[in-house]
Amino acid sequence: MNLPAKLGARGLGVVIFAIALASGARAQVLNSGARTITLQAVLSDSITVSLSSNAVNFNLTAGNASNPGSTSVTATTSWALKPSVGSLKLYAFFSSSTAALTDGAGNNIPSADFQISNNAGPFNALTNTVPFGGANAGLQLSSTPILGNNRTGSRNDVMNLNINLAPLPSLPAATYTGTLTIQAQAI
């Protein structure tokens, strides 16, 4: 027996209607025009420096070369830099080489007698001209080459501070104050 005879006229009509309905459903798909969204994500270049302490005290001994600070200071430098940057440098500086610390009455401790040991290295006086601060009143603490794998990163520099009073044997007793600044530069 063939299919039309098995289904009968009514069954055959139902099958034909179902096929027509299914093919008609596909023919009724309607899509809108495509619309786009423009995306822009900006990661700005940045450098930040944070310090573990913003105050260090010294108990000075007249004429003594070793007058260490009360605490070390850790400078944490963090960055996100553009591909054109080749290095990141960290500097310490005073605004004046002749009066890094002063008693306000004309007696001064020059930057040449203020010393920093960075990351357990030797003590160095602040006698260089750096991009910031006064002439002959700075010190480059570190230089980090910026390569493809460290365009974003951070580093710590642990600074021990000392005031050398050996060159100042007649410095009068007083309270001496000053401001040491730490700043980074990407080049």
Where are these regions (language model features)?
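N-terminal signal peptide c-region/cleavage motif recognized by signal peptidases
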Residues: 22-24
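Bacterial N-terminal signal peptides
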Residues: 13-20
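Bacterial N-terminal signal peptides that target proteins for export
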Residues: 2-13
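N-terminal small/polar-rich segments of proteins
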Residues: 27-122, 128, 138-187
